[in-house]
Each structure stands twice: as structure tokens, then as C-alpha cells.
A protein has these predicted regions:
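C-terminal closing repeat unit and adjoining cap/tail of repeat-based domains
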Residues: 218-240
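Outer membrane beta-barrel
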Residues: 1-95, 106-108, 115-122
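Short coil turns and loop connectors of transmembrane beta-barrels in diderm outer membranes
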Residues: 25-26, 84-85, 119-120, 156-157, ...
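Outer-membrane beta-barrel "beta-signal"
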Residues: 223, 252-265
């Protein structure tokens, strides 16, 4: 389920997640629309290793400097039961943004991953690909590949984290992204801090230099007022160089400040 908003639902009712599923001793099998394995959203996401998550602007692990796959339509997802802390996941989409064309002309998403959670350790490894078959002519794009790895170790008050992404697309981005972050219990809430660095190539810009560099830092604070309501504040700064130096987008070059309240229904 989910609200019908432009930012998350693409103008449709229940655009965040809408699925039919069966669950039992064999695991969980679902069909419908949901977030991908690395999306940070929905019932099947298993992303770990980045304290600031995917909901704080330029500090989001899924921001535009990296490679991410958000939500998919026509999806099939399966998650195994947990075996001593290890859970395996697989996901496929027959059409990431609809199913209006025949199979060979739809975008297809493929994802497989593993998550381990036991005692103080939480970690995940995810491989994903989108074949971009629904693009044509001069706009035709090559298959995108991404691998995400995350590791967290809970020390009690402080949970340090490490995240890494490898991404590759012919005639697109070929990048490595690293993130160091931490979650700290402070004043009845949680402080989230993180820094990222990305380097690689991007064939998309028109500039002659296809090398790219980007880094950002961010900090957020979440204070719960109740089980469903929390106050949130965030500040972040981003800077890029090489082919992205003049990119006029806050995710690449700029800063953000947020203050607000979240309520879950």
C-alpha cells in the first residue's frame, strides 16, 4: 500500500507497493508492484550499510550520483526463511514501468541477494540488472548492472556502517561508490551521519572529459514522539568535479536543509 503522490506513486493509487503474496515455512512469494532489493523501500528490500538510508535527499544511497532501481511493476519476488541468520532473495520484473508492449520490448529487472543478520552483525550483498529494452533509436540504452554491499556492527549506543556500490553500463556510468556512516543514540532519538565518495566514468555528459568525481556529507536526527510520529531534521552538502563539475543539481553540487515531522498510518 502507499499514498498516491507524484514523488512515489507516478500518479497511481497504491503506487508505493501493491502485491498479492503467500507466506509460510517455505518463505515468502509475492506478485505485484514493490521496491527492488536495493531500493530501501518496501517488503523485499535488503539494503544495509548506510545509516542515512534512502530518504534524505542528496545523502540518499539511491541518489542520482549512483545507480539505483526504485520500484517495479509486474514483479515476482521470493525470500527464503532465515537459516541461522542468512536469508536469500530473488526478484524479477516483466516490465518495470508497465506491460504495454510484448516481452521483448519491455524493461526487465533481475535481482538476487543475500542478507545476514545475527547478534551484532547485519550485512547484505545484492546483484541487480535492468536491460532497458523499451528504449529505441538514438535513445536506446545498454543494460545497467549494479552490485551493492553493506556491513553494520551494533556496538550498543553506536552502530558504525560501511557500504560499497559497483555500477556498470556501456555508454553510461561505470562507477565505484563508498560510504562510511554511523547511527548514534542521542537524547532519546537517533543521530545519523555519513560521508560518501564516488569515482569513475560517465559517457552521458557532452563534455570531452568523461571522468567523474563526487562526494557528499550529511547528518540527520530523528526524534520519536510516538510509535507512528517522529520529528526529523537533516543537513547535507555535495560537491562534484571533472565532468560533473558544472552540473546544476543539488545532488551533485549544493546543499540541503530539512526540518519536518513524519507520521505513519
Amino acid at each position: 500500500t502507499g499514498a498516491n503522490t507524484k514523488s512515489n506513486s507516478e500518479g497511481r493509487v497504491f503506487g508505493r507497493e501493491s502485491q498479492l503474496y503467500v507466506q509460510g515455512g517455505f518463505g515468502k512469494l509475492g506478485f505485484g508492484r514493490f521496491g527492488t532489493l536495493s531500493s530501501g523501500a518496501g517488503s523485499y528490500q535488503i539494503l544495509t550499510g548506510w545509516a542515512i538510508g534512502t530518504g534524505f535527499g542528496l545523502s540518499s544511497w539511491t541518489s542520482k550520483i549512483g545507480t539505483s532501481f526504485s520500484r517495479v511493476d509486474n514483479g515476482v519476488a521470493y525470500q527464503t526463511p532465515s537459516f541461522n541468520g542468512l536469508q536469500l532473495s530473488a526478484m524479477y520484473s516483466n516490465g518495470t514501468k508497465g506491460d504495454d508492449e510484448k516481452w521483448s520490448k519491455n524493461n526487465h529487472y533481475y535481482g538476487i541477494g543475500a542478507k545476514y543478520e545475527a547478534n551484532a552483525i547485519k550485512s547484505s550483498l545484492i546483484f541487480e540488472a535492468v536491460d532497458n529494452k523499451d528504449t529505441a533509436g538514438t535513445e536506446k540504452k545498454k543494460t545497467q548492472y549494479a552490485i551493492n554491499f553493506g556491513f553494520e556492527y551494533n556496538l550498543g549506543t553506536v552502530t558504525p556502517m560501511f557500504a560499497y556500490q559497483w555500477a556498470h553500463q556501456d555508454e553510461g556510468k561505470k562507477t565505484n561508490m563508498f560510504g562510511l556512516s554511523a547511527k548514534v543514540a542521542v537524547g532519546g532519538g537517533d543521530a545519523l551521519v555519513g560521508a560518501r565518495y564516488l569515482f569513475g566514468d560517465d559517457d552521458a555528459p557532452t563534455a570531452t572529459d568523461d571522468k567523474v568525481r563526487s562526494w557528499n556529507i550529511g547528518a540527520a536526527y530523528i526524534y520519536p514522539l510516538s510509535k507512528r510520529t517522529a520529528l526529523k531534521a537533516y543537513a547535507g552538502y555535495a560537491d562534484s568535479s571533472k565532468a560533473w563539475k558544472e552540473t546544476e543539481d543539488v545532488v551533485y553540487n549544493g546543499y540541503q536543509l530539512y526540518v519536518g515531522m513524519r507520521h505513519s498510518f
